[in-house]
Structures are given as structure tokens and as C-alpha cells.
Amino acid sequence: MPLIQVTLIEGRTMEAKAALIGSLTQAAVATLGAPRESVRVIIQEVPAAHWGVAGVPKSAAKEPPRDSKA
């Protein structure tokens, strides 16, 4: 049973996360030969203030995630 874990900065739409889950599931089926029903995907969302890039919290950045409604 493949288990795929993804960590993202919060702010993406439910539609974007559903599309990601579908795409990752299909990739596991295609590349690993895993039965679709055995693939698990976990998305963990992290607040931007808890995600640092180059020593700066991502919350300090001016642009939201590309698919964000913000």
C-alpha cells in the first residue's frame, strides 16, 4: 500500500488539493503498478508563519500560493 505524504503551505483550494491527490494516486498506479484503491495520500498544511525560506518566514512574502483564493 503506497502512502504518499505531501507538506504544503496552507492556502490552496479544496479543488487544487483534490486534483493533487488524484494526480499523485494516478502516478503511483502508473509507476508502481499499485491498485488504485491501495494508494493513500496525506496532505499536511503548514501555516506560512511556520515555513521558512532563506531565513525568512514565508508569511513575510508578498505573494500567496499560485492557486490560492487570497
Swiss-Prot record:
Alphabetized InterPro entries for the sequence: 4-OT, 4-OT-like_dom, Tautomerase/MIF_sf
Classification via Gene3D superfamilies: Macrophage Migration Inhibitory Factor (3.30.429.10)
Enzyme class: isomerase
Statement: the UniProt record of this protein carries the keyword Amino-acid biosynthesis: no
Family statement drawn from the similarity comment of this UniProt entry: Belongs to the 4-oxalocrotonate tautomerase family.
Protein name: Probable tautomerase RSp0893
Annotated active site: 2
GO molecular function: isomerase activity
PANTHER family: 2-HYDROXYMUCONATE TAUTOMERASE, TAUTOMERASE-RELATED
Cystine connections: none
Keywords carried by this UniProt record: Isomerase, Plasmid
This protein's record includes keyword Isomerase: yes
EC numbers, comma separated: 5.3.2.-
